[in-house]
Swiss-Prot record:
Protein name stated in the entry: RNA polymerase-associated protein RapA
Molecular function in Gene Ontology: ATP binding; DNA binding; helicase activity; hydrolase activity, acting on acid anhydrides
Function (record text): Transcription regulator that activates transcription by stimulating RNA polymerase (RNAP) recycling in case of stress conditions such as supercoiled DNA or high salt concentrations. Probably acts by releasing the RNAP, when it is trapped or immobilized on tightly supercoiled DNA. Does not activate transcription on linear DNA. Probably not involved in DNA repair.
Biological source species: Shigella dysenteriae serotype 1 (strain Sd197)
Pfam families noted in UniProt: Helicase_C (PF00271), RapA_C (PF12137), SNF2-rel_dom (PF00176), Tudor_1_RapA (PF18339), Tudor_RapA (PF18337)
Length: 968
């Protein structure tokens, strides 16, 4: 290998050193100085791992002074190169630059430059890069993007709402499903879609303080969205880092109290340029035309500044008409400005609902009914569809569905309001109550008497709360270490129940964390019962581990002991037995407890066991909940209303449980009130809205389609390959779970999403739902998306060389595999990837420019090839450099046709879809005022920007592989 002083070479093994200069040569060794790092390297002349750097006409080079030059001619004299060309900055031509004056910090980014500079990647990295390009492009084109990656059951009505709302520009909607139907999950699905597509980047969630942790956990565990919790302390800290503290985070959760308490804080929130605002428990925002509450006014002010708003609220029937109108007013004050007019409008929807019911019943329609439908829809060419719907043909059902869809598009608040009820959604279990009446121990009787004397000045409410938890009264006098569990009959009953139901998973809920911890100790020490504990003092990771241990079938905990607050936001559908060791103070908390098991997807009837002590507030409350509200065995939408109306009487009975005179009458009155309210709610149900929110067959098909995509074996193979190449250790744990841990030889020292301790993953949705410690890996999971970014944003795998053993071809035959990428640059919020994601175009060229790619599929071809070590590869490249240049020029000439075809197809698709959506909404705007002007403007603006961006689309070479035929 001829070396001359002043020549420029690059290290094959340490490319980060930059360009080296030959500074010493003797008979056996050569010394290179690398000016950018100041380091020297001594190599053997005969077999040194370095590659000569030689540029060609057309290349752009940089001098050590920083100016650039386009090379037009290369001269060699005494082994040294001089480049002649035109300077980019001064346009001066005929400039000569000797290679010794080249910039030493040279980085080769183009695949061909890397190949010629000897920066040759491993063959498996090239294959991974191509697969990453291919799968990434395919995933953007897959239907229901953003709906496949969450750790949730595929429940049709939730998917229907999320699919409808998540694709809108700045959605402003009211989610008002009944309890247990998953409003939080629907909101999370919408957020996930909007964030993944780039339609939103900054999200603010406002929820009552008691639910903040639940939201934090749900967003992280189900959607991989890491929110920051802002309270007074965090806000004060952030003020040191930014003028507006909320600019320090993209995703924020705070409480209404936090927002309301400070005018400056509200101003900062309004100025923080959120894309989406989510408000949970929005029915607690009090409003009247004359006196809206401060909380309502604060949210109203925020809603004026934030483009997208999701309000989660109780059902409209529970709220009452005025309160329901107040929520809609937050979404669109221009549309909902007059309460009286709104009430009148609601009455007018009755004929539409009747028409929908008529169509769904499948009966033949009279001429009058057909005419009425035609008038309601108001389309000129509706006649053929009406005739088809009224015929006996096979198309009748689909025609009726289309008519129903058109009616719902044009009438009612269906674009801004979604509401599902348990009546309209299948899949809920029965709930069976088992009460166990137990005697009140003398120790408790004594403690209660003393407490009554000493606490005479306490309010009735405080006495009532004390009486619900006699063990705490006992501890007040005997000390925190008092062993109440030695005599409390509930403990004895619980141990007996658990030992006789060893095969059952049992969820035990009590009000306080201390009770849960004491029960765990007793169960473990006395009966050897495996019990996990779950309370608010534990970190999210500790709770995950406890939940995972409870979920394990054979070796897991039999019991999970939960405190009231600790169990928020967690669901354990795999268990169907629940023990309430004590009772919560109000019906909402009772429903929340039962809701841990009573979810869609629960496979068994729920057995609710309530051991209670006679002559205590527990005995009063268990009767009131069961006989007065029927709250154990059915959901109770009337609970809060009745609770508020009889609060004072109920508190007195709870505070003095031995004085029961008149209690039977109270229960009877409550039951009558409950039945009357329930009937009233049922009568007020909006069937039209339910049909729209539920989604019917369309929603079912959506769930089935995503379920099919869950079985994508390509993902598993790709992920394992990706983890191997990044350098992530994989340990198969069985049960469809794998433990990933970082290794010492990773491509990057800290891979986002992979902690030092490692993580457990699964590709199985059912396993992920049962095991909260296992992350559910899909194409949308951050681990995969970060891996794709790591490979595709750098030059990993962009140039390689392989040998093809094929005796049918002459030795030394050259093939060049080119991977071009066709793409358009645009802001993320345009969601250009719907039409033209970065798309790979593969070419396999021989030296005559014949493209053999269609004849030899990538994976088949890849299996026939053998790797070449880097040093041998560099020698091969140097030997055929001119031939490769010629083939590259042939590739450049051919790619334009393929790229143009892709770009034109994307333009046509974008124009067709966006124009159709705009036309549909413009037509509906004439008959449905719930379509906002700003939505139409945004779609038109989006269409124009998308078309302009596609006009600017181009292509570039992303990777290349040189293939040399051999017979050995």
């Amino acid at each position: 290998m001829p070396f001359t002083l002043g020549q420029r070479w690059i290290s094959d093994t340490e490319s980060e050193l930059g360009l080296g200069t030959v500074v010493a040569v003797d008979a056996r060794t050569v010394t290179l100085l690398f000016p950018s790092t100041g380091e020297n390297r001594l190599y053997a002349r005969s077999d040194s791992p370095v590659t000569r750097v030689m540029f060609n006409p057309g290349d752009t080079i940089t001098s050590h002074d920083g100016w650039q030059m386009q090379v037009e001619e290369v001269k060699e004299e005494n082994g040294l190169l001089t480049y002649i060309g035109t300077r980019r900055d001064t346009e001066e031509s005929g400039v000569a630059l000797r290679e010794v004056f080249l910039d030493s910090k040279l980085v080769f980014s183009k695949p061909q430059d890397r190949l010629f500079a000897g920066q040759i990647d491993r063959m498996d990295r090239f294959a991974l890069r191509y697969r990453a390009r291919k799968y990434s492009s395919e995933q953007f084109r897959m239907p229901y993007s953003g709906l496949r990656g969450q750790r949730t059951s595929l429940i049709p009505h939730q998917l229907n709402i999320a699919h409808d709302v998540g694709r809108r520009h700045a959605p402003r909607v009211l989610l008002a499903d009944e309890v247990g139907l998953g409003k939080t999950i629907e909101a999370g699905m919408i957020l996930h879609q909007q964030l993944l597509s780039g339609a939103a980047e900054r999200v603010l969630i406002i929820v009552p303080e008691t639910l903040q942790h639940q939201w934090l956990v749900e967003m992280l565990r189900r959607f991989n969205l890491r929110f920051a919790l802002f309270d007074d302390e965090r806000y004060a800290e952030a003020q040191h880092d930014a003028y507006n503290p909320f600019d320090t985070e993209q995703l924020v959760i705070c409480s209404p109290d936090f927002v309301r308490r400070s005018k400056q804080r509200l101003e900062h929130l309004c100025e923080a340029e959120w894309d989406l605002l989510v408000v949970d428990e929005a029915h607690h925002l009090v409003w009247s035309e004359d006196a809206p509450s401060r909380e309502y006014q604060a949210i109203e002010q925020l809603a004026e500044h934030v483009p997208g708003v999701l309000l989660l609220t109780a059902t409209p029937e529970q709220l009452g008409m005025e309160s329901h109108f107040a929520r809609l007013r937050l979404l669109d004050p221009n549309r909902f400005h007059d309460f009286a007019q709104f009430v009148e409008e609601q009455k007018n929807y009755r004929p539409v609902a009747d028409a929908v019911a008529m169509l769904l019943a499948g009966n033949k329609l009279s001429n009058d009914e057909l005419n009425m439908l035609g008038e309601m829809i108001g389309e000129q060419d509706i006649e053929p569809l009406l005739q088809a719907a009224n015929s006996d043909s096979e198309d009748a059902q689909s025609a009726r569905q289309e008519l129903v869809s058109m009616l719902m598009d044009r009438h009612g608040t269906s674009r801004v309001l979604f509401r599902n009820t348990r009546n309209g959604v299948k899949g809920f279990p029965k709930r069976e109550l088992h009460t166990i009446k137990l005697p009140l121990p003398t120790q408790y009787q004594t403690a209660i008497k003393v407490s009554g004397i000493m606490g005479a000045r306490k309010s009735a409410e405080d006495r009532a709360r004390d009486m619900l938890y006699p063990e705490r009264i006992y501890q007040e006098f005997e000390g925190d270490n008092a062993t109440w569990w030695n005599f409390d009959p509930r403990v004895e009953w619980l141990m007996g129940y658990l030992t006789s139901h060893r095969s059952q998973k049992v969820l035990v809920i009590c009000a306080k964390a201390a009770t849960a911890l004491q029960l765990e100790q007793v169960l473990r020490e006395r009966e050897g019962i495996r019990a996990a504990v779950f309370h608010e003092g534990m970190s999210i990771i500790e709770r995950d581990r406890a939940a995972a241990w409870f979920a394990e079938e054979d070796t897991g905990a039999q019991v999970l002991l939960c405190s009231e607050i600790g169990s928020e936001g967690r669901n354990f559908q795999f268990a169907s037995h629940m023990v309430m060791f004590d009772l919560p103070f109000n019906p909402d908390l009772l429903e929340q407890r039962i809701g841990r098991l009573d979810r869609i997807g629960q496979a068994h009837d729920i057995q609710i066991h309530v051991p209670y002590l006679e002559k205590t507030a527990q005995s009063v409350l268990v009767r009131w909940y069961h006989e007065g509200l029927d709250a154990f065995e059915h959901t109770c939408p009337t609970g809060r209303t009745i609770y508020d109306s009889v609060y004072n009487d109920l508190i007195n009975y709870l505070a003095s449980p031995d004085q029961t005179e008149g209690f039977d009458d109270l229960i009877k009155n409550c039951r009558e009130q409950h039945e009357a309210l329930k009937a009233q709610l049922e009568q007020g149900r909006d069937r039209l809205l339910e049909i729209h929110s539920n989604g019917g067959e369309k929603a079912q098909a959506l769930a089935e389609s995503i379920e099919e995509q869950d079985d994508d074996t390509n993902l598993i193979a790709f992920a394992m390959n990706l983890f191997d190449i990044i350098g992530i250790n994989q340990d198969d744990r069985g049960d469809n779970m794998i433990v990933l841990t970082p290794s010492d030889h990773m491509l990057v020292p800290d891979f986002p999403g992979l902690s030092e301790d490692g993580i457990t993953i699964t590709f199985d949705r059912e396993v992920a739902l049962a095991r909260e410690d296992a992350q559910f890996i899909t194409w949308e999971h951050p681990l995969i998306r970060n891996g794709l970014d790591l490979i595709l944003s750098g030059d990993t795998g962009s140039s390689t060389i392989s040998l093809l053993k094929n005796k049918a071809l002459p030795v030394g035959t050259l093939l060049v595999e080119l991977i071009y990428v066709v793409e358009a640059q645009a802001p993320k919020q345009l969601q250009l990837n719907r039409f033209l994601p970065p798309t790979p175009v593969r070419m396999l060229l021989d030296k005559n420019g014949n493209n053999l790619a269609a004849l030899v599929e990538f994976e088949t071809f890849n299996r026939q090839l053998n790797a070449v070590n880097r040093h041998t590869g560099s020698k091969l490249v140097n030997a055929v450099q001119q031939d490769v240049h010629a083939i590259l020029q042939l590739g450049e000439a051919q790619i334009e046709k393929s790229a143009r075809a892709l770009i034109d197809a994307a333009r046509n698709e974008a124009d067709e879809k966006l124009s159709a959506e705009l036309s549909r909404l413009e037509a509906l705007r004439a008959v449905n005022p719930n379509i906002r002007d700003d939505e139409l403007t945004a779609i038109e603006s989006n269409r124009q920007q998308v078309m302009e961006s596609l006009d600017q689309a181009g292509w570039r070479l992303d990777a290349l592989r040189l293939i040399v035929v051999t017979h050995q």
